[in-house]
Amino acid sequence: MPDNFSFVIEGRLAGMARPGRSSPLEEDLAFLMVRGIGAIVSMTERPLDEGMVSGFGLRYLHLPVPDFCAPTIQQIEAFLVFLGDADHAGGVVVHCYAGQGRTGTMLACALVHHGMSADEAIRLVRAKRPPSIDTLVQEQIIFDFAALRENVTSHVQGDRHG
């Protein structure tokens, strides 16, 4: 079994440590397939073997983020587009090296995108995947993304009612 694998949204959205970190990559990819995962988002600086990933029929997105750093708003938006596109292909798993900081940050942003507040999303991710979201900069990007999302939503609603 891969290190630190668990669902945040059962069957739809999961996090884990880098596939192939403590067992052969092929075994970890087979594990994901059995659990209904259809796509992988890799946040490590070094990508996975894309040929092997696609050989298992998995979709793949590489968004490199240095360890202990946070993804950019543009990377979060690219992830959400990929998540929407992958919706019909089964669940999506996000990974960084240990499956904690960068992974937890991106999972929390997905929950914010689906309507949770930043505080709720951080609490849920940390409850389901302790310890997640390692640094203040990772926490801050979740709050920044939530504020941006709220600002865009209020402008769209204002345009409809104005």
Predicted regions and their residues:
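Short cysteine clusters
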Residues: 96
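Conserved G/P- and acidic residue-centered "switch" motifs that form tight phosphate/ATP-binding loops
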Residues: 99
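Cys-dependent protein tyrosine phosphatase-like superfamily
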Residues: 1-93, 107-162
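Transmembrane helix boundary and interhelical junction motifs in multipass membrane proteins
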Residues: 102-105
